């Protein structure tokens, strides 16, 4: 059966010149524990990151975003913070942080920290004092005495379920009350209805801004507020009827524990703190927000008519919806959905991987690694890359006895692999030496991937063509005017050929062709775009494509092999040479 997909097309106006540093920025997520170990303990650290900053500069990055580095008992690998103003000792200390910050400035890189405001560790002094009903801290968290249950017992005040399964309420014997935890029981939720909490968390931001950071990525934003208490009780959430497992968070529709109206005002208040600093030296501090929620809710993070919010509310349309068998038409749908929803005066961003998802090649297809990196670097505005995706790192199977991810460890040996995020967090593969050049330790915190001897930075940097070489060429090329300012016209031909054109009048245009299918397809550009020139110059293509860079090709008859991409250019009035 032949499937016909109608031609999709839409056009966006060109962007203005004089861009701020972040508006067309390339951001790189470093998972510090896995990036580079400088002291031989098998765990990555800040001095290791500092050692590799030159590499990040060389591959075209503008911003370096660090996953959490603050003091933590590591119940959730840094997302359970016991002191917001200290560095986790495994990663270094404040002096190591200062070395990192200074080196970033020297190289022209912007340092972004992970800010985890929804909760703390249960080992934080805030929580310990709250348990003791210290006058200052007694209402720093969400407490409730419980309601009467059978046989004169106390039961939780609502049916809320945590992200990590089971009740969101945990009984504290010392205080004789329940406390709320939307994540692990070791991660009690802060009470943002308390003005003292709001001010204290603003002061945490100021502390790190004073130390020179360029912004923050805000974790788990939709969970900041819950619906307020009414008549001594919290409102129950309705059943979703999508699962019969009452411990599963999907058992409920989270109408009371996510996306509350007060959340957006809190984001706007934090943006105001960042702007205080930006005004003092005319250097923009940025906010990224993480929220796995509906697209309209994500768009609200941008701000409104009276208040600015996050410059970069993470766009999860692709990461949440595109699968290994997705077509070009599918991909275009999710790209268009974001572009249609985004306010005209805001910047797009594209996120294809992170520490909570399987690696790009494992999730979407190893053959398509370059295809997706081509898309990431040529779609409008901001790109975010998870460490190792530039070389095509893949998930590494981790046996049960070496699994450390709390999400997996709370299951069992039969089912843990469905929950574990460890496979996408293995050490960075720098070279073919011991532990892939990550560490000199006898044992690393997670096993190094089995393929490190053939898949690493050193090998790819020396190859004639490789994922890394393609990535570096893309990041260099995307700084050109057509990709920083150009409008975009997207079309889908058949089911699997996605083609988009970026153009600047009187300068030229770039055409990006992505073949999501397994079969070769002729581009046929003259049938897709008006005034398409017959011949265009190859800028860069997937590793699977044999056509050399810089050659000119017939854009109607050129055949693009399956699961690959190519970038073509035509500069008006010039015979372009691509460096």
UniProtKB/Swiss-Prot annotation:
InterPro entries xrefs:
Glyco_hydro_13_cat_dom (IPR006047), Glycoside_hydrolase_SF (IPR017853), O16G_dom_2 (IPR045857)
SUPFAM superfamilies, sorted: (Trans)glycosidases
Any one Gene Ontology molecular-function term assigned to this protein's record = alpha-1,4-glucosidase activity
Where is the protein localized? Secreted
* Binding positions for Ca(2+) 2 per the UniProt entry: 118, 189, 223-224, 226
GO BP terms, alphabetized? carbohydrate metabolic process
Q: Where does Ca(2+) 1 bind?
A: 37, 39, 41, 43, 45
Q: Which EC main class describes this enzyme?
A: hydrolase
* Residues that bind N-acetyl-beta-D-glucosamine: 325
The record's listing under CDD domains reads: AmyAc_maltase
Q: In which tissues is it expressed?
A: Saliva (at protein level). Proximal lateral lobes of the salivary gland (at protein level).
| Official protein name in the record | Salivary alpha-glucosidase
